[in-house]
């Protein structure tokens, strides 16, 4: 996509990182307009498991969430090493990874921002006719806070 933009074959494209960063580096900030949060939307990566799996595998779920919290701590305490790990595993240059990661907010959290995003998506789905219901779910009722409350209670603000 970046090459097509440089050649003038396209006027715009919609992609995830690293391509917006690479386009800006290649073409220059003055010629590239990258729309990102809060301009368009926020992005979260959520863990979703079925109740049955959770009930049968509580130890595994706890270990998984604990590993994510430890990874977050490592990232915060070792930013240089974290960049090198991501660069090695993605094949991207450390400078590219650094430019991308500076824009990110890494955290294992349950907060009101997540609830807001879920409600916005529900409203969108209802308007698009993608939902069999016209009611926005009460997401507080379906979000399991028990593991994160045990591991890192400060991360739970909902």
Feature map (PLM): residue ranges:
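Pocket-lining segment of extracytoplasmic ligand-binding domains
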Residues: 1-88
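Conserved C-terminal helix/tail region of periplasmic/extracytoplasmic solute-binding proteins
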Residues: 126-158
